[in-house]
């Protein structure tokens, strides 16, 4: 279970690794950092945008993980279970293209998680003199981590909400996002976003009070309380 302060923020699951300690004003863009492969399909696409002023090469590395989080266990995916194409992309400044992911694993009732790392590599090696006299790269390699969730082929989207105790439970076998906004006129920044995996439970006093509370599942909003007029927030 993950908590995100500010329902419009998706800072979790993002890791930017630089070979040079310099600010990254422009870099790779991949959209939402958590994306899902629906139960009824076998492939999903992810758009990559080159926001730099020069060309870049993009490559992918995939690890199977037991569950997203700081203590996750990474393993090599079973051969042929999750494939992607193309092997790499070469994009000029401002260009974009798609990587496609193909799932050929078990068609059961278990949800599976993969950490997908997008690696952005400069096509040229520009250097400058460091204060110590050596040379350092002025165009760093950037790695952005995302999470791909393969929903169960036999999916069960189930949940429960107890307003008396302020509890939302994921009683199914696939993840969803819970948006909690205290009060009917609160801003996006005042809300919280929780990512609930199967079996996760959220206890929050705000859930006992009037507010705009939603579940987000497959990009659809599900209002779980009737205390405020319906006005879906952003899913980002």
Curated annotation (Swiss-Prot):
Residues 1-27 form the signal peptide. InterPro entries: Ig-like_fold (IPR013783), PapD-like_sf (IPR008962). Keywords: Chaperone, Fimbrium biogenesis, Signal. The keyword RNA-binding does not apply. The keyword Chaperone applies. Disulfide bonds: none annotated. Gene3D superfamilies: Immunoglobulins (2.60.40.10). Induction: Negatively regulated by H-NS. Positively regulated by IHF and EcpR. Belongs to the EcpB/EcpE family. Part of the ecpRABCDE operon, which encodes the E.coli common pilus (ECP). ECP is found in both commensal and pathogenic strains and plays a dual role in early-stage biofilm development and host cell recognition. This is Probable fimbrial chaperone EcpE. The gene is ecpE.
């Amino acid at each position: 279970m993950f908590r995100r302060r500010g329902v419009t923020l998706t800072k979790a699951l993002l890791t930017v690794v630089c070979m040079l300690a310099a600010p990254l004003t422009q870099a790779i863009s991949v959209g939402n950092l958590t994306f899902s492969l629906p139960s009824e399909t076998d492939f999903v696409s992810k758009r990559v945008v080159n926001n730099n002023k020069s060309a870049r090469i993009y490559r992918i590395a995939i690890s199977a993980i037991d569950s997203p989080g700081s203590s996750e266990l990474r393993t090599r995916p079973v051969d042929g279970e999750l494939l992607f194409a193309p092997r790499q992309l070469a994009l000029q400044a401002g260009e974009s293209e798609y990587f496609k992911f193909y799932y050929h694993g078990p068609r059961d009732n278990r949800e599976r998680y993969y950490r997908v790392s997008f690696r952005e590599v400069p096509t040229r090696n520009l250097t400058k003199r460091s204060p110590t006299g050596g040379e350092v790269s002025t165009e760093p390699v950037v790695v952005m981590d995302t999470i791909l969730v393969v929903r169960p082929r036999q999916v069960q989207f189930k949940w429960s909400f107890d307003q008396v105790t302020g509890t939302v439970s994921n009683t199914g076998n696939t993840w969803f996002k819970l948006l909690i906004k205290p009060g009917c006129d609160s801003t996006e920044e005042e809300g919280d976003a929780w990512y609930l995996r199967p079996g996760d439970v959220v206890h929050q006093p705000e859930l006992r009070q009037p507010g705009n509370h939603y579940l987000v599942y497959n990009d659809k909003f599900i209002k779980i309380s009737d205390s405020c007029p319906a006005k879906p927030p952003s899913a980002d």
